């Protein structure tokens, strides 16, 4: 998909991705006020980016909340230049809740995972109750080695993660910065201190345990030891509001939907979880 907008949409119960954008650069795609639930991945973007925005959305009860990845098997690597702003990402990796299959299991349990991608922006998101990591930055080894680099992770709230709220792995995880985040735990320790956005960065500040968890998940896939949840058993989505005007609303051709959509990036609030 390129040059398009998903808005006010609900997707649930997919063994793969509730929402997926892949193989485009620049994509010119906006996801605004969407919900992805009970799926292998709430949002997945492979080899996508460039004028790419995911804003004001909810990704809940998925194997993995959101991921941007790079794979040699698809066109236009690496994934890069995606803005993820003001989203709610909760309850990622609870095995009895979300549908899934082998491909989604490799990064299960992470709220937002940036795997082998470049220059993404994570800002004002709220990530809670991830089984493994709230935010994970990790390189990827495919036919080529894809470092995770030049990401900006700032002003996010990350709570109640199983391993770490903020995690950076791999020896090639360089030139990423973390600033202004509200969190309790990080791997490695002092991630914001050693890799801040306005000061000195120490390139050795990464943690190989994140890589071991990733490779352990791959081993589970190859041995068939991960739990498969049938998508047909997932909760039926609740009634959703209809489009303005209902079936009688006038049909307007989407000639240039990306340009016509008002993003208002500076006015997007910090995402919060409803009480």
Language-model segments: residues:
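Hydrophobic, well-ordered secondary-structure elements that form the walls
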Residues: 153-156, 178
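Right-handed parallel beta-helix/beta-solenoid
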Residues: 1-121, 136-150, 167-175
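Non-catalytic carbohydrate-binding regions of carbohydrate-active enzymes
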Residues: 127-128, 132-137
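A short, structured loop/turn motif at beta-sheet edges
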Residues: 121-126, 157-160
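Acidic, glycine- and Ser/Thr-rich low-complexity intrinsically disordered tracts
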Residues: 160-275
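Glutamate identity and glutamate-enriched acidic tracts
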Residues: 7, 74, 95-97, 105, ...
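Surface-exposed substrate-engagement region within the catalytic domains
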Residues: 129, 144-152, 160
């Amino acid at each position: 998909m390129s040059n398009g907008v998903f808005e006010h949409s609900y997707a649930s119960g997919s063994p793969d991705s509730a929402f997926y954008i892949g193989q485009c650069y620049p994509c010119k795609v906006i996801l605004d006020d969407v919900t992805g639930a009970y799926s292998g991945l709430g949002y997945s973007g492979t080899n996508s980016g460039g004028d790419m925005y995911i804003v004001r959305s909810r990704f809940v009860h998925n194997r993995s909340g959101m991921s941007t990845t790079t794979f040699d098997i698809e066109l236009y690597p690496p994934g890069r230049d995606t803005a993820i702003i003001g989203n709610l990402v909760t309850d990622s990796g609870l095995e009895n809740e979300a549908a899934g299959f082998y491909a989604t299991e490799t990064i299960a349990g992470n709220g937002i995972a940036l795997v082998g991608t470049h220059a993404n922006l994570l800002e004002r998101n709220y990530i809670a109750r991830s089984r493994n990591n709230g935010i994970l930055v990790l390189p990827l080894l495919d036919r080529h080695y894809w470092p995770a680099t030049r990401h900006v992770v700032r002003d996010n709230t990350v709570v109640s993660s199983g391993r770490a709220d903020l995690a950076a792995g791999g020896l090639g995880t360089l030139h990423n910065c973390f600033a202004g985040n509200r969190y309790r735990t990080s791997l490695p320790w002092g991630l914001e201190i050693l890799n801040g956005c306005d000061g000195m960065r120490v390139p050795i500040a990464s943690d190989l345990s994140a890589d071991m968890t990733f490779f352990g998940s791959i081993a589970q896939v190859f041995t068939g030891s991960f739990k498969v949840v049938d998508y047909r058993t997932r909760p039926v989505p609740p009634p959703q509001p209809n489009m303005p005007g209902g079936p009688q609303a006038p049909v307007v051709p989407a000639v240039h939907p990306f340009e016509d959509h008002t993003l208002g990036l500076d006015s997007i609030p910090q995402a919060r979880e409803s009480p």
